[in-house]
């Protein structure tokens, strides 16, 4: 599931952040994933049950922190599935246009992108959800075929494109910063790393299906680390060839299949007029087709992660029993899958991709940061619990994982932080209103210590919402984010007052 078609072009499509140094962005992102992957591997061998980071934190850091991580994972999987579904729709339009079949824009884009409703995006979510409801056995066979197809196309592109690499295109390898944070230079590399981090989303989702894996204590760590290594090599080689066959400025501002298509168009010889005639025009269609299939697996694994996390949270009483109901025929959480099918389908049909896409990386990075922190906790609180794999060089590896992920998060836009904090505050409201009252723990979060921690976290989030709002207003202005800023300030001050009242009352 790590081998996906996104990430490789995202840095270019968003005005160009890195230039040829995109390979460094992948290296930094992979480094952060490696640290987090080692921590995930220890937990997967120690606690081989569904729920991913939520379950790990529930067993080591308590219910409140587990809720925060679980709610963050819901954001991560929801926006990831939404973003990829919208992108799938765009690539489908491009593929059909190559066959001289033209779909009306009104039915392939949301209202903010010049359409009415994105029907293909909605339909692919429905199809993948129904696939998952039938069980992961069929999904695994389908996913295996897709991975084989994607890896084959990547290798074909690399092999055919290697001889067209022009080393002059790597100069300058790190373009000078434009004066704007995150546009080229070192800050651009870090922002690029945070964006392409989405391409590595997968090994954490793999751990959500631990209950359905044969011999999870042995196979989960192996699957996580080996897949991470293989995909890092594939991504970096692919990016190296892309930036070698075409100058990085050729990718800026392109839409659709442009990142790969532009590179393929440069894989040829110039004619008498100086125009390059591509030697492999068929490769474009093959790339688009593999991306379409590749996106299917990405959508499927994110939808799988969503339902499994909610399944675990419902088992613990933090969410209604609806989410833990198992279908007798298929032995899957069908009701939960259907709910997320509707939610993600509607988001994919009516929300612009740019809004959902910006949230994916920051949610993932936050979850990874907390998992790395959980390893430090579990080594002190549960040192004697058997595990077939141990994170090496503790506390160095977890600390490096925390620092790497936080560093990438800091270079994401301020409005992305605002949306994250707003989402977490909403989650805290649900925990206070339902989770604490229905927790299956003897006391749940309703202890003096738990209440103090809850109130402090709520107050910190509210203050952080104010800070990020002011940061965005000062650096970018009101602009298109005026509504978001107003909502964030109202939400922040309301919650500041609420949690200060709770602290005073205690």
Residue ranges and their predicted role:
Residues 1-12:
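Single conserved hydrophobic/aromatic residue that forms the stacking wall/gate
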Residues 10, 72-90, 195, 200, ...:
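Membrane-helix boundary/coupling elements in multi-pass transport proteins
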Residues 10-110, 230, 237, 486-491:
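Extracellular loop-to-transmembrane helix junctions
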Residues 89-98, 148-177, 239-246, 373-385, ...:
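Hydrophobic alpha-helical segments and their helix-loop junctions in multi-pass secondary transporters
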Residues 113-116, 323-332, 368-419, 426-462:
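C-terminal membrane-solvent junction of multi-pass transporters and transport-like membrane proteins
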């Amino acid at each position: 599931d790590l081998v996906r078609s996104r990430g490789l072009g995202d840095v270019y499509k968003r005005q160009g952040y890195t230039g040829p140094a995109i390979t460094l962005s992948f290296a930094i992102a992979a480094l952060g994933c490696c640290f987090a992957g080692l921590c995930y591997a220890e937990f997967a061998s120690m606690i081989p049950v569904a729920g991913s980071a939520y379950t790990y934190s529930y067993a080591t850091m308590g219910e409140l922190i587990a809720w925060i991580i679980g709610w963050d994972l819901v954001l991560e999987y929801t926006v990831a599935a939404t973003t990829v579904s919208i992108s799938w729709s765009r690539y489908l339009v491009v593929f059909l246009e190559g066959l001289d079949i033209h779909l009306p824009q009104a039915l392939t884009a949301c209202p903010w992108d010049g359409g009415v409703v994105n029907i293909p995006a909605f339909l692919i979510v429905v199809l993948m959800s129904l696939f998952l409801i039938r069980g992961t056995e069929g999904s695994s066979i389908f996913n295996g075929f897709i991975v084989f197809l994607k890896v084959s196309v990547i290798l074909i592109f690399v092999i055919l494109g290697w001889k067209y690499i022009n080393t002059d295109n790597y100069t300058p390898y790190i373009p000078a910063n434009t004066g704007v944070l995150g546009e080229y230079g070192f800050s651009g590399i870090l922002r690029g790393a945070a964006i392409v981090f989405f391409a590595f989303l997968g090994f954490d989702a793999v751990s959500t299906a631990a209950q359905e894996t044969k011999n999870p204590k042995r196979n989960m760590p192996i699957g996580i680390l080996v897949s991470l290594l293989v995909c890092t090599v594939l991504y970096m080689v692919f990016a190296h060839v892309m930036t070698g066959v075409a100058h990085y400025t050729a990718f800026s501002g392109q839409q659709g299949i442009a990142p790969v298509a532009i590179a393929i168009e440069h894989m040829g010889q110039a004619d008498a007029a100086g125009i390059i005639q591509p030697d492999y025009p068929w490769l474009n269609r093959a790339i688009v087709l593999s991306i379409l299939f590749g996106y299917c697996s990405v959508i499927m694994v994110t939808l799988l992660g969503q339902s499994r996390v909610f399944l675990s949270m419902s088992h613990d009483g933090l969410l209604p029993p609806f989410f833990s109901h198992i279908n007798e025929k298929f032995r899957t959480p069908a009701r939960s899958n259907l709910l997320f099918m509707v939610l993600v389908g509607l988001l994919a049909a009516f929300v612009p991709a740019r809004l959902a896409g910006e949230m994916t990386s920051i949610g993932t990075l936050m979850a990874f940061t907390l998992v790395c922190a959980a390893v430090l906790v579990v080594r002190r609180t549960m040192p004697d619990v058997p595990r077939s794999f141990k994170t090496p060089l503790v506390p160095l590896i977890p600390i490096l994982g925390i620092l790497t992920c936080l560093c990438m998060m800091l270079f994401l836009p301020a409005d992305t932080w605002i949306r994250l904090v707003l989402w977490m505050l909403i989650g805290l409201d649900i925990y206070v209103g339902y989770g604490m009252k229905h927790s299956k723990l003897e006391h749940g979060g309703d202890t003096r210590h738990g209440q103090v921690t809850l109130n402090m976290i709520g107050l910190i989030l509210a203050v952080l919402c104010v800070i990020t709002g002011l940061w965005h207003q000062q650096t970018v202005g009101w602009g298109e984010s005026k509504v978001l800023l107003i909502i964030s300030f109202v939400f922040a001050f309301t919650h500041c007052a609420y949690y200060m009242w709770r602290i005073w009352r205690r």
